[in-house]
Each structure stands twice: as structure tokens, then as C-alpha cells.
């Protein structure tokens, strides 16, 4: 686990250090935090077009989007992040698993099922890095998704939809994105 391929990054010091840190006077276990992150998402294709349209916030006013995310947050009693682009919709939950997140979305959306992809823990971070760096875009390396991601993070922070601790998760996605874009020359 210390060698994850190119670029060669030595991660051994991270495995030796304590996973418990103090943030704003509160002890926080980083392993517990990352294991408590979940995501449900859909990338548009011919089989899920109607579902993506149903759950997207593209085209909603800022007030309607904020209300939608707040309703999800209230239903879960947990922080939630939402991002919609022209070809995907994704929701990240904190302190809930992906099944709970999906259940809340289905109930709020008044539908019985939707073809969400589920991710939990570190896989959420990995997928967000892949999406934001443009590696999962129709045009490899495009910058638009990163811009949309930053805008969505800023909106969630500005309106208190994410705590400081949970919003810092997205700072790590942005940092990793910079490294990937530099390594691949995007």
C-alpha cells in the first residue's frame, strides 16, 4: 500500500501517524470521517436520462436548489453536498451510508427507484478526483467540471450546508485535482 504506482508517492508516514486530530478544540478521527462519507451518482446515458433529469438541479433557481439540498440534509440529519452538470448528478453524504442517502433522495423525489451508482469511504474521494480532473468527462481533461465543482462547494459553504470539517474534504479533492492536471499536462 506504500507504492500506488506513478507518480511515486511515499505514504508510509501517513500510516504511522495517529488518525485522531484536534480541529476547533474537538477531537476528530480522520479514518472515521472518511469511512463515513458516501456518494450516489449517475452519469447520463440512454438508460438513465429520465432519472438524471428528475434529480438534477440544473436549471433551478439558486433558492430552489438550496431548498432542495436543505430538504435532503434535514431528512438525513446530516451534511449533504449536491452537484449537477450537463451529464451527471451526484450527492455526497457525511455520517450516512450510500443506501441511506439514496433512500432520502428517492423519498424526496417521490420515486421508487433510480439507477444510482453507490460509493463509500475513500472511493468517494477517488471518484470526485476522477470527475473533477476531467478523466471521466466526454472531453478528457476539460476544465468545466472543476469550475462547476468549485462553485458548488462555495455555494454549500456560503449557505451553511456543510460544516467546516466536512467541507475540508472537498479541499483535498481540489488539491489532488491540481496534482493530476499537472502530471497529465492538462
Name every feature range the model reports, one short phrase each.
Residues 2, 9-20, 25, 29-137:
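A glycine-rich (often HGG/GG-containing) alpha/beta subdomain
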Residues 114-186:
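Glycine/serine-rich phosphate-binding loop and adjoining beta1-alpha1 elements at the start
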Amino acid at each position: 500500500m506504500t507504492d500506488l504506482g506513478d507518480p511515486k508517492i511515499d505514504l508510509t508516514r501517513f500510516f504511522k501517524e495517529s488518525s485522531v486530530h484536534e480541529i476547533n478544540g474537538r477531537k476528530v478521527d480522520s479514518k472515521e470521517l472518511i469511512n463515513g462519507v458516501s456518494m450516489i451518482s449517475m452519469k447520463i446515458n440512454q438508460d438513465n436520462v429520465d432519472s438524471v433529469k428528475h434529480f438534477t438541479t440544473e436549471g433551478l433557481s439558486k433558492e430552489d436548489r438550496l431548498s432542495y439540498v436543505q430538504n435532503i440534509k434535514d431528512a438525513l440529519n446530516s451534511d449533504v453536498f449536491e452537484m449537477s452538470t450537463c451529464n451527471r448528478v451526484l450527492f455526497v453524504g457525511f455520517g450516512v451510508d450510500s443506501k441511506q442517502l439514496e433512500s432520502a433522495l428517492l423519498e424526496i423525489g417521490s420515486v421508487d427507484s433510480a439507477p444510482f451508482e453507490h460509493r463509500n469511504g475513500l472511493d468517494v474521494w477517488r471518484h470526485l478526483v476522477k470527475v473533477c480532473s476531467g478523466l471521466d468527462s466526454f472531453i478528457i481533461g476539460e476544465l468545466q467540471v472543476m469550475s462547476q465543482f468549485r462553485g458548488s462547494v462555495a455555494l454549500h459553504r456560503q449557505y451553511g450546508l456543510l460544516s467546516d470539517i466536512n467541507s475540508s474534504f472537498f479541499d483535498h479533492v481540489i488539491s489532488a485535482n491540481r496534482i493530476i492536471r499537472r502530471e497529465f499536462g492538462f
